[in-house]
């Protein structure tokens, strides 16, 4: 949704309430469960019309880092960016919850809506522990597609709680849903990449890391 003035919090709350029963606005629902890597998506003709993006960074090691990262995700720290307003940060990470993302890009306020459609929470078959979620776009989102946000702790084989890499992963597939998005495709891709970099840095900050991501 393109806006010439910044919507009020009450307007956004009403927009979200109006969309609680709205259907997802893209094909390949739950598609972010299909594969582990970007390369696998790019080999599947089903995703040939989508831009597929993936980044996976190490946040640190051990259970303490994992717990900090999970807490940050639950508080939506990965959206705590100076050019993005997230609505609303008291929203629990639960299937069916709808959220709004507002950003200012090239003179427009862009307001988008997405709904959480599945979760990761607990032990995985490979022995790792994951916490995270996926959300899919609703009508009026400038893109059509789905994105997953996952914290993963690859536990040490010997069970040492202070060992084992902790990762933050984002994977998405998307395509423009408006002619303005298509016309401004390079700008859209710029902001998508900027979001990935800034989100990674917020998660690194949340776990107390001194690392910094400059590009992906």
Swiss-Prot record:
In terms of InterPro entries, this protein maps to:
DUF1990
Q: Which residues form a coiled coil?
A: none
Would you say which domain of life the source belongs to? Eukaryota
Instruction: Check the record and name the PANTHER family matching this protein.
Output: UPF0548 PROTEIN (PTHR34202:SF1)
Family stated for the protein in its record: Belongs to the UPF0548 family.
Protein known as: UPF0548 protein
Organism of origin: Dictyostelium discoideum (Social amoeba)
């Amino acid at each position: 949704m393109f806006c010439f003035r910044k919507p009020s919090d009450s307007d956004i709350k009403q927009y979200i309430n109006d969309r609680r029963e709205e259907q997802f606005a893209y094909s390949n629902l739950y598609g972010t469960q299909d594969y582990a890597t970007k390369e696998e998506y790019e080999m599947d003709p089903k995703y040939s019309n989508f831009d597929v993006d993936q980044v996976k960074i190490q946040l640190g090691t051990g259970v303490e880092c994992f717990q900090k990262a999970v807490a940050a995700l639950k508080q939506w720290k990965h959206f705590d960016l100076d050019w993005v307003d997230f609505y609303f940060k008291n929203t629990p990470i639960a299937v069916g919850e709808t959220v709004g993302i507002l950003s200012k890009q090239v003179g427009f306020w862009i307001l988008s809506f997405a709904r959480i459609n599945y979760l990761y929470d607990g032990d995985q078959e490979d022995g790792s522990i994951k916490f995270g979620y996926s959300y899919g776009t609703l009508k009026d989102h400038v893109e059509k597609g789905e994105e997953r946000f996952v914290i993963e702790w690859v536990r040490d084989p010997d069970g040492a709680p202070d060992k084992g890499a902790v990762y933050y992963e984002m994977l998405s597939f998307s395509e423009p849903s408006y002619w303005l998005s298509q016309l401004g495709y390079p700008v859209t891709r710029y902001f998508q990449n900027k979001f990935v970099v800034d989100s990674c840095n917020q998660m690194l900050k949340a776990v107390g890391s001194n690392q910094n991501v400059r590009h992906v």
